[in-house]
């Protein structure tokens, strides 16, 4: 009897040891998994359209020392197939972005001349602080705000393979892109297990976008032709800017509606941002952006954001981020566009304006009355995406 009791006791103690061992093993495994997840690179796509303030938002990320940033890598795809359409190029753009997110820069071989190349072969490479500092270029400290103008002079001759090295040395990879007119093309990236993708969807008042496009017509001529696609030959030249805006506005509507149909887990990887909200409260909105992707808002970046949005005038170059009064820039269409153009544009983009929270003006007097706030706080995005 005593032997039987001892045997049962030993079996009980043995089972407890096994349970404890399993618990320790599972705890260690969970801890290691969490640590691996925390080390996993974060991929961020700033999704926008032309002349919507996306260069500034790209710089908000790109100036952070933990970020590898590229501005519009899909430019290379579109400039290779200038006779194609945006819809036909979606797949090629998506595949290029996936490769760049994974720091595989060999994807550019299909869109660049063969043979040795420099990092200056990349479109707007000098906008990337990561390509202007170590390990790529030693002229600029990694923890200081980089100057694209000076970087272009000093760092352009670095070999192209340094781009991949720089990418792999950062924990965040951020790409800014304006050449997606549909969310459907992005679905494979959102569900790709090799990516940790977050999407920042930036929009801007279509009237401000239209005004800015008027000032950059020559620079955007190829992009506009690709957007218009088969409609290019059938639409009068004077109507083409409005039709291009109609397509762009519809794409923003489609993206927002598509996001609302995604599973909640994927919706949590999406952040909606209006340019006007950003320039009204740049520090608060930048804090929101950084929190969304897991970046710290460092003191020197807070100072830079304050200064770059509180400069004088309208800025020196349409495609560069420099000190300007960002709030005045966002309102410039109200005193510079004739009401006839505004009215025609509102007809083309009415659905997008209602959805995104931009109030229409019904007269020249309303347009010029700057005390009349045309930014609505009660819009569908505020109801669906309440974070921030």
UniProtKB/Swiss-Prot annotation:
One GO cellular component term: Golgi membrane
Tissue specificity statement from the Swiss-Prot or TrEMBL entry: Specifically expressed in high endothelial venules (HEV) of peripheral lymph nodes.
InterPro entries: Carbohydrate_sulfotransferase (IPR016469), Gal/GlcNAc/GalNAc_ST (IPR051135), P-loop_NTPase (IPR027417), Sulfotransferase_dom (IPR000863)
This enzyme's EC code(s): 2.8.2.-
Any one GO BP annotation for this protein: inflammatory response
Record's bilayer topology term: Single-pass type II membrane protein
Main location: Golgi
Positions in the Lumenal compartment: 29-388
Cellular location(s): Golgi apparatus membrane
Reported function: Sulfotransferase involved in SELL/L-selectin ligand biosynthesis pathway. Contributes to generate sialyl 6-sulfo Lewis X determinant (also known as MECA-79 epitope) for SELL recognition, a prerequisite for continuous lymphocyte homing into peripheral lymph nodes and antigen immune surveillance.
PANTHER family: CARBOHYDRATE SULFOTRANSFERASE, CARBOHYDRATE SULFOTRANSFERASE 4
Protein name per UniProt: Carbohydrate sulfotransferase 4
Gene coding for it: Chst4
